[in-house]
Amino acid sequence: MSPSKQCLVWGYVILSAAVCALVMAEEGPLIADMDTVFHKPPVDEKTRQPKGTCELVEGRFGKAVKFSFTTDSGGFFTGWRNPTANWDEYAGFSFWVKGDGSKTFGCLELIDGEDYGKRYGVPFSLADTEWRKVTVPWCDVIPEIPKGDLVDVRDGYKPSAFRNLWVGKFYYWRHYPQQSFCIDEIRLEKSIPVETKYCTPEVPGVARVVEKLKAGRPVTIVTMGDSLTDFNHWANKPVAWPKLLVEGLKKRYPNAEIALVNPAIGGTQLSQNLILMEQNVVPHKPDLVTVCFGYNDYDGGMRKAQWVKFLRFGVDRIRRLTEGRADVLLLTTCPAATRWEEMKELSEGAREVAAGKKTGLADVEAAFLKAGAGNKERLYCSDKVHLGPEGHALVAETVLDALK
């Protein structure tokens, strides 16, 4: 080889090494290299047998850990990490995942070192059977219950307080099919861009979806909610307000093509459903997302100041994940006959958020307090919490009035 070619080769080697060194320098520190198994599988309480397995396999970088669940089993593989204060200096974290090609989702769960009530979820799709990188800003590490504040290194929950790193799927995902996935290299990320341009809509309220309905264009409505909305709840078998809403819209707009998607899950709270959005909302490309929560949240300790904070975050998350496509309609918290005015502060918070974030608003609380002034029990089923036919009709009418 001539001296000039040798110089070119060595120059290429040196340049490549410099590029690699630069890339490595820009990478954040590892949280877990996943070259060893440090998680323990969940155990069935009755049989005391593990609900799944975790094993080493070939990874994206060296080895990785494969997590497998048996059919009809949920829960989490438990594991621990010891973060340092410098976690708070990073924008979030990333990990590599290889799915099983199914439509199900896996989840990372980060839990506070001293209080299990402060636990946070990060869902991920298992659709890809090739390695892909998932990047998560701290703001998208979402508290599962009201005890946890939103993650914010400035004035919220600080990532350096996490101690547990669990892998699995949530109990409230309802379905527990067999699934498996591989995880490799979980590491901190110095910079993660968060798109905020969709958080402030060009057209406020629900004007866009109303125009589509008037024009007879296809419209998809997703109704996020708890047992007051869930089609699977026993109280909603005879009638449910989302179906009555669609019937009312079709009468008002005879040419409208309306698809209804109802991912509501009884017993859940707003934050849990925000975690599940990538599975239950985003794939449907909704034109309208209705948000109906409050009773379970209040039971969990949610009060106005925190409710306002979570609702604002929820509206932004819906707009971000739907890339501004979806109009958002907030429903004020529906009273219960046994809790008639106790949750008014949550409804006050919803009104404030709707005005500030320029969403639509269906004031369900005001409608119920007015209609039930003389005989509120008629709006409910036997437990005086869940809705009877008249209650469902009133919610549907209130939402319909908001879509004018």
Task: Give residue spans per PLM region.
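Bacterial N-terminal signal peptides
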Residues: 10-21
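Extracellular carbohydrate-recognition regions
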Residues: 25-47, 197-202
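Short carbohydrate-recognition loop motifs
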Residues: 53-75
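Extracellular ligand-binding interfaces
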Residues: 70-151, 176-182
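Extracellular beta-strand elements of beta-rich domains used
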Residues: 95, 136, 165, 170, ...
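Alpha-helical cap/lid subdomain in secreted, periplasmic
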Residues: 114-117, 240-259, 268, 272-404
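Extracellular carbohydrate recognition
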Residues: 159, 173-189
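Serine-esterase "nucleophile elbow" of acetyl-processing enzymes
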Residues: 198-263, 276-285
